[in-house]
Swiss-Prot record:
GO terms for cellular component: plasma membrane. Coiled coil: none annotated. GTP binds at D29, H30, G31, K32, S33, T34, N145, K146, I147, D148. InterPro entries: EF-4, EFG_III/V, EFG_V-like, EFTu-like_2, G_TR_CS, LepA_C_sf, LepA_CTD, LepA_IV. The keyword Endoplasmic reticulum does not apply. NCBIfam families: lepA, small_GTP. This is Elongation factor 4. The gene is lepA. It catalyses: GTP + H2O = GDP + phosphate + H(+). It comes from Pseudarthrobacter chlorophenolicus (strain ATCC 700700 / DSM 12829 / CIP 107037 / JCM 12360 / KCTC 9906 / NCIMB 13794 / A6). It is found in: Cell membrane.
């Protein structure tokens, strides 16, 4: 008999005892989406002819980069010993920027599959997500993936996994998402080992939102896990954090295509459609209840997504400003963590200050704007939010160097993160050197096995948002992995460095940096601009300044015409007169002349070397 269930349990009439909710947690590239594909095939939910790789990753960028950005939930039938079970698989993002989404997806489950690449072993984000799963008291099934690879070392990593979560290396399942080996055994183990969901079917309805997606035709599709009670179509529901109420137009399950049902009961995972057009109306982590019979208390763990990294986005062509505004509005419909406000720059024109969860979020948003809306954008160097206290006790929050107050400053506080770095032990020295150079304070070090080490540091967020990850990868030959989470604020000695051209400040090049690094930034920026700005008829000084104190200077030499070319021989006083006249002209020119900074110079000065390499590859 095929283990595929002959009669799949019907939504809204499913006994919680036969429901199993689980998610797959893994580091990027450990084969999470491929394993999900094999499960969809094994359970017969997706026919072989419709199958495509990374079936659940719907966005082009997700498929190209091989990463999962939005969570997905799929209901699959599976039969064990003659009983048909309903398995709800919630696919989660693996990247550190999307940790909050992962934590909500974990809260919607009773169990988690801890997936580890048999050729690479445990990585930093696997650990971070494992700790999240343990905090949520999930039952964990350890699994080694990619055992078909020639470089796989299943015995070594099975022992590492077993020592990490306690248990026997023999209990670690070995599967291959590519060939499908061991997938059926894994599905059987999910049914046997994971607990059934618990909840009160007669209590007022409570369902937790773990994701919401904007659909052009149907509005916001909200994915929920029902904890108590029942939800039915055509009921009026209420969001408990915003108190907004909506009518349920459609309710159903994804299998994996949306299938409407008569409702959702305790323990079930499905989707709701209310016709709302903005994902901010259904926030991830919020509780949905019945308006007529509301629940007294919302489910725990809800938090507003808070942007950590800010960057200015400007269209290369000023006429594209309205297009950029519309594009950001549309992206906001699908991305509750994105915030933006208009800003102007004397150098770059009109644009927006946009807040992101992290650098990957910034990169993906920018790529989507350029690709889906055909925009050419300049993005300014990413920076973080500082809290500046003035001497009159007034507090200013600064996300843009041009907003930095000029008065008497009592103290500046900057956001901190606690970072966990995993790497082979031969790179410990290089990692410590890197973290020390970024003002890091060591928090501890643990050996996971004889050749893998976990290093914990507390670092300023501003030091890791720019190029920390790239340098870490190159110093550890690609073996290092990083995970971080916000960890309060601390007082720091920060200054604003202004770049001036001929005494005029250029706001786009200003930066807030630590006093020790201000000189290095000034020298780097003035040197870069000297090469990029074309020579003028007069000498142009490029200066870096903190307040009124100049800390670095470069000069662009003047182009001069050879005024003596027409003098053949002749009197020295004649030549001197011509030279003096030229000198006077240059002096007058310098008084009234302005320096135009070409667009190319802006782009080149604001992009890091890494993004230049990317542009060359294009």
């Amino acid at each position: 008999m095929s283990p595929m269930a002959r009669t799949a349990p019907v939504p809204a009439a499913t006994d919680p005892a036969i429901i199993r909710n689980f998610c797959i947690i893994a580091h990027i590239d450990h084969g999470k989406s491929t394993l999900a594909d094999r499960m969809l095939q094994s359970t017969g939910v997706v026919q072989a002819r419709d199958m495509k790789a990374q079936y659940l990753d719907r966005m082009d960028i997700e498929r190209e980069r091989g990463i999962t950005i939005k969570s997905q939930a799929v209901r699959m039938p599976w039969e064990v010993e003659g009983v048909s079970y309903a398995l709800n698989m919630i696919d989660t993002p693996g990247h550190v920027d999307f940790t909050y989404e992962v934590s909500r997806s974990l809260a919607a489950c009773e169990g988690a599959i801890l997936l580890v690449d048999a050729a690479q072993g445990i990585e930093a984000q696997t650990l971070a997500n494992l700790y999240l799963a343990m905090e949520n008291n999930l039952t964990i099934i350890p699994v080694l993936n990619k055992i078909d690879l020639p470089a796989a070392q299943p015995e070594k990593y099975a022992a590492e996994l077993a020592s990490l979560i306690g248990g026997d290396p023999e209990d670690v399942l070995r599967v291959s998402g590519k060939t499908g080996v061991g997938v059926e055994a894994l599905l059987d183990k999910i049914v046997r080992d994971l607990p059934a969901p618990e909840g009160n079917p007669d209590a007022p309805a409570r369902a937790m939102i773990f994701d919401s997606v904007y659909d052009t035709y149907r509005g916001v599709v909200t994915y929920v896990r029902v904890v108590d009670g029942m939800l039915h179509p055509r009921e009026r529901i209420q969001m408990m954090s915003t108190r907004a109420s909506h009518e349920l137009l459609e309710i159903g399950v994804s299998s994996p295509e949306p299938t409407p049902s008569k409702g959702l009961g305790v323990g079930e995972v499905g989707y709701l459609i209310t016709g709302v057009k903005d994902v901010r109306q259904s926030k991830v982590g919020d509780t949905v209840t019945n308006l007529a019979k509301p629940a007294a208390q919302s489910l725990p763990g809800y938090a507003d997504a808070k942007p950590m990294v800010f960057s200015g986005l400007y269209p290369l062509d000023g006429a594209d400003y309205p297009v950029l505004r519309d594009a950001l509005e549309k992206l906001m419909l699908n991305d509750a963590a994105l915030v933006y406000e208009p800003e102007t720059s004397a150098a770059l024109g009109f644009g927006f200050r946009v807040g992101f969860l992290g650098l990957l979020h910034l990169e993906i948003t920018r790529e989507r704007l350029e690709r889906e809306y055909n925009l050419d954008l300049i993005s300014t160097a990413p920076n973080v939010e500082y809290e500046v206290t003035l001497e009159d006790k007034k507090v200013v929050r600064v996300t843009n160097p041009s907003e930095y107050p000029t008065g008497k400053i009592a103290e500046v506080r900057e956001p901190m993160v606690s970072a966990t770095i995993l790497a082979p032990n031969e790179f410990v020295g290089a990692i410590m050197e890197l973290c020390q150079s970024r003002r890091g304070v060591m928090g501890g070090m643990d050996y996971l096995s004889e050749d893998r080490v976990e290093i914990r540091y507390r670092l300023p967020l501003a030091e890791i948002v720019f190029d920390f990850f790239d340098i870490l990868k190159s110093k550890t030959r690609g073996y290092g992995s990083l995970d971080w989470k916000a960890d309060g604020e601390q007082v720091a000695d920060l200054v604003k460095v202004d770049i001036m051209l001929q005494g005029e400040q250029v706001d786009a090049f200003s930066a807030i940096t630590h006093r020790e690094k201000a000189y290095a930034y000034g020298v780097m920026m003035t040197g870069k601009l000297r090469e990029l700005i074309p020579r003028q008829q007069f000498e142009v000084p490029i200066q870096a300044a903190i307040g009124s104190r100049i800390i670095a200077r470069e000069s662009i030499r003047a182009i001069r015409k050879d005024v003596l070319a027409k003098c053949y021989g002749g009197d020295i006083s004649r030549k001197r007169k011509l030279l003096e006249k030229q000198k006077e002209g240059k002096k007058r020119m310098k008084m009234v002349g302005t320096v135009e900074v070409p667009q190319e110079a802006f782009i080149a000065a604001l992009t890091t070397d890494e993004s230049k390499d990317k542009a060359k590859k294009k």
